[in-house]
């Protein structure tokens, strides 16, 4: 499932427990990410899913659910 894969990438990138990550988690407010973390996270997602996320789309991604929805719409 996409959520589990995304959750594991986020946990690894941010060095946090995967159990803390929910679909509603905000990268900045809930998970403590800064703008550099988000750039690195987008790059990790692009590599893992073999896609390219345009900057205008990346700027709209604020929560874990946003990532899952974005990736689901690509399939």
From Swiss-Prot:
Biological or metabolic pathway of the protein: Lipid metabolism; fatty acid biosynthesis
Keyword terms of this UniProt record: Cytoplasm, Fatty acid biosynthesis, Fatty acid metabolism, Lipid biosynthesis, Lipid metabolism, Phosphopantetheine, Phosphoprotein
Modified residues (O-(pantetheine 4'-phosphoryl)serine): 35
GO cellular component, one term: membrane
Carrier domain span: 1-75
Example GO biological process: lipid A biosynthetic process
Listed Pfam families: PP-binding (PF00550)
Single Gene Ontology MF annotation: acyl binding
Localization: Cytoplasm
Keyword flag Cell wall biogenesis/degradation: no
SUPFAM superfamilies: ACP-like
Mod. after translation: 4'-phosphopantetheine is transferred from CoA to a specific serine of apo-ACP by AcpS. This modification is essential for activity because fatty acids are bound in thioester linkage to the sulfhydryl of the prosthetic group.
Superkingdom field: Bacteria
Function: Carrier of the growing fatty acid chain in fatty acid biosynthesis.
Family: Belongs to the acyl carrier protein (ACP) family.
Protein name in UniProt: Acyl carrier protein
Organism of origin: Thermoanaerobacter pseudethanolicus (strain ATCC 33223 / 39E)
Name of the encoding gene: acpP
């Amino acid at each position: 499932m996409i959520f589990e894969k995304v959750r594991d990438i986020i946990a690894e990138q941010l060095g946090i427990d995967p159990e803390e990550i929910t679909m509603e988690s905000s990268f900045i407010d809930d998970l403590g990410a800064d703008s550099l973390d988000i750039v690195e996270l987008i790059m990790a997602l692009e590599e893992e899913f073999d896609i390219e996320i345009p900057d205008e789309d990346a700027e709209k991604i604020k929560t874990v659910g946003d990532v899952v929805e974005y990736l689901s719409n690509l399939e």
